[in-house]
Amino acid sequence: MPILFHMSTQEGYEYGIVDEPGLPMLEEALEKYPGLKFIGHSQPFWHEISQDAKPDLKSRMEWGRGPVREGGRLVCLMRNYKNLYADLSANSGGCAIMRDEKFGLQFLEEFQDRLMFGTDMVNTDMVFPLGEWLDRQYQEGKLSAQAYRKICFENAKKIFQL
């Protein structure tokens, strides 16, 4: 059974599992349980997409902005651990992808088999612009049909056996 987890930066600060900058505890879990699918989610998780991710508490709880620098810890973990998946549904995932269109599209294509919409909350008042962004990228031919289908519904159907 896969697990989708929300991440926090320190105990008592916010809900979720706690990890340090660079996600060393997540890596330890990925190594220890190679047959378990971990689905990452939330700001501290997506913050690590860029090589210039700052280690301070405030930065790790932000959505991130500006160009993504190659060599981010999250990208390294995704490349090294096939049991690491990622949830794009919240604005943390959306901002990580949309903040740098070229990088975001490359990331979506490279990891299309392990990206999906999943969430840890139900809130009809929040706006999540990534869905429309993905639709537009697909319609404009910037995102392949295969990646679009997998990310939008096929991966979730497969992983959760729907």
What is each model feature region?
Residues M1-F117:
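Catalytic pocket-lining loop regions of alpha/beta-barrel enzymes
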